[in-house]
Amino acid sequence: MERQNDTQQKVFSGLFWRFLERGGSQIVTLLVTIILQRLLEPTMYGTVSKVTVITAILLVFVDSGMANALIQKKDPDDLDFSSVFYFNIFFCLLLYLALFLLSPWLSVVFREPGLTPVLRVLGLTLIVAGLKNVQEAYVKKTMQFKRFFFATLGGTLFSGALGIVLALRGFGVWALVAQQLSNAAVNTAILWLTIPWRPKRMFSWWRLQGLLSYGWKLLVASLIDQGYQKIYLIITGILQGNAEMAFFEKGQNWPNLLMDSVNTTMDSVLLPALSAEQERKERLRSMTRRAIQIGSFVIMPLLAGFAACATPLVRLLVTEKWLPTVPYLRIFCVIYAFYPMHLANLNAIKALGRSDMFLLLEIVKRGLELVILLCTVRHGAYVMALGLLGSELASQGINAWPNGRLIDYSYWKQLKDIAPILLLSLLMAACVYGLSFLALPDALILLIQIMLGIGIYAGGARLLKLDSFDYLIGTIRNLMLKKKAG
């Protein structure tokens, strides 16, 4: 019982600080993005998008397998952390060298002559990531998520200010490059200043092999996932140009800002928490169920409401030149609404040490999605996005399937748990969407939509006595009472 309470306390603390970090940084990022989108043309965003597609795929090699292996391992020590750190640095230098040499060829592939210097400068984020990766794993393993708050917020504020100043001074594409690179650099510097762990002068190839045996499967799975996600942007950029690529990317990024605050919080805190309970299947099932319910309760209404008021919101914040973003934005709102299910199921599988199952699921999902992509690619970016929506909904069931056997929590049980939340979110969105057609200023329409949406969802949750609503209210009350008692 004492162990359970200790785990619960760490989870609550981790969730609080991680959500505060992600929420704060996403608010700042959103404000900076709005300002930059008003200052810069969609074609400039398209150029930088091509670079971030490439670096995002390469960052998978740094961010995925080995860090997760350290977190999943029962009792990693300094030898484990130091071995992974030195391996990462060496590997990141090799990746950057390859990117530096291949930049001219990639410029030809993307039909963008000026891409070479942008690739070579923004590619430095690979080296920065190598310095940060093990520090992040250490924070997650020890569940000291308060450390992330200062690092992320500091990096976001500094890089946002720098990007805006450079954009105002006419630096164009380089304003976006400086923003992204400085964000990574400042974030990493603050982590190094605030975290006591330092790499020791020790290295064990034997220890590294043990971590690789678990981590390489997650690495391949993440590489397949990231490559598949980015291929839509690559195809859109090559076939339909920078502007359409920017509309597609921003349609994806705006819902992602909302989703990321909750899902990154869950993803960071859940894996170490579930790994600590990997030998107690009943406890693991209970925590997975709670994560799906709470995540869905928060994310679904946010994204449903966002999709419903997308047109007046985009027009008000970033002007009419970005209205072609709206159809993509609505599609990605639906996709991301179900991500708490994806993450909770996958984290349960990882916590049990079943990286082989994780990789198998990724291969099956991406195989299905590749078939859908091949069928939709000739019809343009919008039809491709609809195909992505269909494949992501199918992936829900695929991700949930193993947990019916592993922890006795089937896909059908999961759907029953979130059904009231989904239906209430859809009802709220339908009511909010109807207000978009009022002959009123956009700001006033949005204000009415937000107030009505909150009223319908909160009132409906209370009326239906949703378990997630009662749980959140109870948790907040307990935390406040503990704070007063302390």
Each language-model region and where it sits:
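Membrane-proximal transmembrane or re-entrant/amphipathic helices at the cytosolic face
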Residues: 2-3, 401-404, 409-411, 418, ...
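Transmembrane helical elements of multi-pass membrane transporters/channels
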Residues: 14-29, 155, 176-179, 183, ...
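Membrane-interface junctions at transmembrane-helix termini in multi-pass inner-membrane proteins
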Residues: 8-12, 69-78, 128-151, 165, ...
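Hydrophobic alpha-helical transmembrane segments
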Residues: 116-123, 151-196, 210-214, 247-252, ...
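Signature of the first transmembrane helix
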Residues: 7-66, 90-103, 120, 125, ...
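N-terminal membrane topogenesis motif
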Residues: 1-30, 68-71, 75-86, 115, ...
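Helix-loop junctions and terminal segments of transmembrane helices
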Residues: 29, 61-78, 140-141, 199, ...
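Interhelical loop/hinge segments that connect adjacent transmembrane helices in multipass membrane
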Residues: 1-7, 11, 146, 189-234, ...
